[in-house]
Curated annotation (Swiss-Prot):
Enzyme Commission code: 2.1.1.33
Gene name linked to the record: trmB
Biased composition (Polar residues): 1-12
Similarity-based family: Belongs to the class I-like SAM-binding methyltransferase superfamily. TrmB family.
Stored NCBIfam families: tRNA (guanosine(46)-N7)-methyltransferase TrmB (TIGR00091)
Residue sites binding substrate per the record: 149, 181, 216-219
The UniProt record lists the keyword Methyltransferase: yes
Active site: 145
Keyword Transferase: yes
CDD domains: AdoMet_MTases
Residues that coordinate or bind S-adenosyl-L-methionine: 70, 95, 122, 145
Listed name of the protein: tRNA (guanine-N(7)-)-methyltransferase
Region (Disordered), start-end ranges: 1-20
Domain of life: Bacteria
Amino acid sequence: MTDTAENQTPNDRQAGHPRSIRSFVLRQSHMTAAQQRAIDTLWDSFGIDYQATPVDLDANFGSNRPKILEIGFGMGTATAEIALRLPETDFLAIDVHGPGVGNLLKLINENHLENIRVMRHDAVEVVENMLQDGSLDGIHIFFPDPWHKKRHHKRRLIQAPFIAKLLPKLKTGGYIHLATDWEEYAQQMLEVLSSFDSLQNTATDYAPTPDYRPETKFEARGKRLGHGVWDLVFKRIR
């Protein structure tokens, strides 16, 4: 299923690069007038269209500040808050859902944020084709879809092959920060990250929530359901 044409960013209609298994499902979602207006008026300033060739992030941001990749930002509320808390850091935020893209662009405008750029595309393809090796200082993946049913676990984003694609993009000394409210997925995340010799856990197992990460709607929902929340922060050591 794909989003309707009026919910698309200018680059959405291009031919994709098919993969056999995706970690997301595109759902028909309602785009508010304000979200669509934000896309129409702000995309040229804060959006980055997908291309199958490497991109110069410093040129796109107009700065050489540290660069953080955020994969899956939902409605963008936490992303905007983190960018406010870390004004000397640039954030490349990627998601596939139109209303969230529009909402984050609206928040960028409302909060006068200059340190966020937005992409609406499959993050795996962006990592594979657009990001240069050693271009990232950090990677945030907060509350990715846990795909609860066992037969769907193959759709989970955090698996060794994807981490292997991410690692070359991360500078030595850079970090990967994951968070989930699904305990079994947290265990899988811990096992996957621990399997890489080039990554070192900053905690014994799960890390305290860093000060920069605000509570997301997914976290609040999980707490209401009685779930715990697990943060993992691993540093690239070589």
